[in-house]
Structures are given as structure tokens and as C-alpha cells.
């Protein structure tokens, strides 16, 4: 297992060194990746069109009429890392009757009375449906770990509980796509400052965001362990280089398309040939 410790100078771009002497997965990402507006527009439209065609097949609205496997897209990432913008462009052309977006914040009093996975069940899609989760059960091993809302025994146990949960979902046919949206500390600060100065967006910036930023080393360590222990064959993590919003949005949708195609083929559904498609560089 590679557990990473933040070193001084992280904000200046120095890599984190892991216990085994290697570099963490987050530091392997090339945050300089970007697209021109023209290339973004072309690839975004292409990927959105392809996703719509696949969704119609999965929903039984085209093709042979069979209802396809559920598709669940899960987002985690830093504050201001672009989750909302990516989600908006992911679903904007899809039939809202068959796609549901759910955002998860801190659990309510009643939700705390149950097992931590309990509250996510109603948001999961059934066959023919699609769900998008803005935050998820990974809060147990991220914010609840760092802020000590969960005991050490609870969050350590959660890795196996999450793996078993996702294994069950996959066994029932679900296509699960997991994203970690990654941005540099400097880019996060720039976005925070822009939000703070914008009267139409300042509400999105909270005192909690600033507090979390100060704890970035602790969160980075938690993220690295999460990736190490829950990146599984049936539920892979896709790390998105997010300093460029254009790059990130295209990569997200192209990745969902690729995973939907793969999942459909594995489950015996014919995947129609795409007229044209460019693939974002994978991590």
C-alpha cells in the first residue's frame, strides 16, 4: 500500500513522497493539459451526441427495445474542482425522465442513525436508468476521516464495506464510473478568489471551504489511500486533470462514453459504431 505524506513546498508543486519511496497518484497527473475552445466544442458535442445515443439504447428507447443496465456516475474531488460544471455538461442533453442528479452533503440526524451506506440507496439507478452523484459514500474515508466525524475503526472498516457494496452493484449489472476531480492548490486559490469577488457566485464559497484548504495535506493522504484501496476491476477510479475546465469536461464525458460502451458489450448489448470520436488521455 502506498500512503503519502505531504512535504513542505507542496503548494509550489513539489511531489509528495510515499512510504515505499514512490510518488502518489495525484502527483502523477499532468495539470498543464488543456484544450483550445474550438477543440473543446468539437469534442464535447461529439461525446454528448454519442452519450445520448447510448442512453437511448440503455433506456430501451432505441435499439432492440431491451432495457439496459443501470449507469451510475460518481464524482469526488476538491472544493471548486469543477464537479458541478462537468455534471451540467454530462446531463444537459439527456432525457431528464431517465437521469437523476443527487448532491450529498453532511448526513442528517436521522441518516446518522443508520449505517453510513443507507442514505445512498434511494439515489441509485435501476435498470434502464442513470444516476449522477455529486459526492458519495466516499465521504466516510475522506471528510469524515479527516474531520474525525467517524472513528478510526469506522473509517478503516469502511474500505471493505465500500468494496463489498460496489461489488454487489456490479454483480447486479450496474456500470459504475468513479471520478476524482483534481486541481492544484494554486488553481483552487484562484477559483476561491474569483468566487469571493463575484456577487452571483460568492454564495458557493464558505468558511468550511477555507478550513478544508488548510487541511489539504491530511486530505491528500486520505485520497491516496482511498485510491489505493478502492480502485478495483469492477469499479475503477478515473483521475481528471482539472486545472483546465475545458480539458476536464471533455475527459469526463468521453470517459463515461467509453465505460458505458465497455459495460454494454460485457453485458451482451450491441454497441453501435460511433461515426467519430476522440478519446481523452486516460489516467
PLM regions: where:
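Short glycine-/polar-rich loops that comprise or flank the Walker A/P-loop
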Residues: 95-100, 126-129, 169-177, 198-201, ...
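Conserved nucleotide-sensing/catalytic segment adjacent to the nucleotide-binding pocket
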Residues: 36, 99-104, 109-154
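Charged, amphipathic alpha-helical linker segments immediately N-terminal to NTP-binding catalytic cores
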Residues: 7, 16-48
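Phosphate-binding beta-loop-alpha motif at adenosine-nucleotide cofactor sites
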Residues: 73, 174-187, 207-211, 232-251
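Glycine-rich phosphate-binding P-loop
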Residues: 75-90
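Phosphate-binding P-loop
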Residues: 58-69
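A glycine- and Lys/Arg-enriched "phosphate-lid" helix/loop adjacent to the NTP-binding pocket
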Residues: 3, 34, 143-161, 169-221, ...
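NTP-dependent small-molecule kinase module
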Residues: 2, 215, 221-283
Amino acid at each position: 500500500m502506498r500512503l503519502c505524506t505531504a512535504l513542505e513546498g507542496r503548494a509550489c508543486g513539489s511531489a509528495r513522497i510515499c512510504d515505499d519511496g514512490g510518488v502518489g497518484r495525484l502527483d502523477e497527473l499532468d495539470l498543464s493539459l488543456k484544450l483550445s475552445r474550438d477543440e473543446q466544442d468539437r469534442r464535447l458535442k461529439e461525446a454528448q451526441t454519442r452519450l445520448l445515443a447510448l442512453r437511448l439504447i440503455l433506456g430501451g428507447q432505441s435499439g432492440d427495445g431491451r432495457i439496459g443496465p443501470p449507469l451510475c456516475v460518481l464524482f469526488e474531488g476538491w472544493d471548486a474542482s469543477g464537479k458541478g460544471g462537468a455534471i451540467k455538461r454530462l446531463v444537459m442533453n439527456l432525457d431528464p425522465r431517465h437521469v437523476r442528479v443527487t448532491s450529498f452533503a453532511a448526513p442528517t440526524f436521522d441518516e446518522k442513525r443508520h449505517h453510513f451506506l443507507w442514505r445512498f440507496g434511494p439515489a441509485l439507478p435501476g435498470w434502464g436508468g442513470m444516476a449522477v452523484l455529486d459526492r458519495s459514500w466516499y465521504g466516510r474515508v475522506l471528510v469524515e476521516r479527516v474531520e474525525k466525524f467517524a472513528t478510526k475503526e469506522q473509517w478503516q472498516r469502511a474500505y471493505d464495506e465500500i468494496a463489498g457494496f460496489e461489488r454487489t452493484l456490479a454483480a447486479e449489472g450496474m456500470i459504475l464510473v468513479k471520478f476524482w476531480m483534481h486541481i492544484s492548490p494554486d488553481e483552487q486559490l484562484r477559483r476561491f478568489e474569483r468566487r469571493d469577488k463575484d456577487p452571483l457566485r460568492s454564495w458557493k464559497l464558505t468558511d468550511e471551504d477555507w478550513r478544508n484548504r488548510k487541511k489539504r495535506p491530511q486530505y491528500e493522504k486520505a485520497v491516496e489511500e482511498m485510491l489505493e484501496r478502492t480502485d478495483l476491476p469492477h469499479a475503477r477510479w478515473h483521475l481528471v486533470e482539472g486545472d483546465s475546465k475545458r480539458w476536464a469536461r471533455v475527459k469526463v464525458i468521453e470517459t463515461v462514453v467509453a465505460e458505458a460502451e465497455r459495460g454494454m458489450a460485457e453485458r451482451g448489448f450491441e454497441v453501435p459504431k460511433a461515426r467519430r470520436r476522440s478519446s481523452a488521455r486516460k489516467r
